[in-house]
Regions:
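Structured soluble/peripheral alpha/beta segments that form catalytic or ligand/cofactor-binding pockets
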Residues: 1-190
């Protein structure tokens, strides 16, 4: 696909390289959320071109009115991609810790974490009896925020995005450095 922002002189071309689906517990019709943790991107800004890895999440459904979440998507060039969330939809808890591992083989392997949780500067999960710690710097090198509203619905949520340096540790051993997008949002969804 292509995204064009002519007023900013930006064009992004992307290709979906990995896609996974699963349901969110609070969605009344059990519609699956689509996760695309590996978008292969080319970003053109005037006379400059940059390669990038992107993420897309697509969901539609009948959700409770209130929600809140912390989400992180991190890319480690020599190891893989981690995406993780700790969320509440209404009174339903929803969290996950996923690793798209590219370090062991040429074939990508999706590993699902258990016992996952988030803190202000970290996300944690257990995968195959190993403890994964995704740590990110307290200082963002780029950030953006906005109030999300839709009419005629009553959605009003504050969305914040922050880009930060990240470190991946497995069983207290550092295995990689990368970049992460930390996203958090709280308010109403309907």
């Amino acid at each position: 696909g292509t995204i064009c922002l002519p007023e900013a002189n930006i064009e992004i071309q992307f290709q979906v390289a990995a896609e996974f689906t699963w349901a969110v517990p609070a969605e009344k019709n059990h519609r699956a959320v689509i996760h695309q943790p590996k978008l292969l991107c080319t970003v053109n800004t005037g006379d400059r071109t940059q390669k990038a890895i992107g993420y897309c999440k697509i969901y539609d459904g009948d959700y409770p009115k209130f929600w809140g979440y912390h989400f992180v998507h991190a890319f480690f060039p020599d190891y893989g991609i981690i995406w993780s969330a700790e969320a509440t939809f209404g009174e339903e808890k929803y969290n996950y810790f996923k690793l798209l591992n590219t370090s062991q083989t040429e074939k990508e392997i999706l590993l699902n974490g258990e016992d996952s949780y988030h803190r202000k500067t970290s996300a944690h999960g257990r995968i195959q009896d190993k403890i994964y710690h995704l740590k990110f710097d307290n200082n963002a090198f780029a950030n953006w925020s906005s109030i999300l509203r839709n009419q005629p619905s009553t959605m009003e949520s504050k969305l914040c995005l922050e880009y930060r340096p990240a470190i991946l540790e497995i069983d207290d051993q550092k295995v990689g450095e990368g970049i992460c997008l930390k996203e958090f949002c709280f308010g109403t969804i309907t």
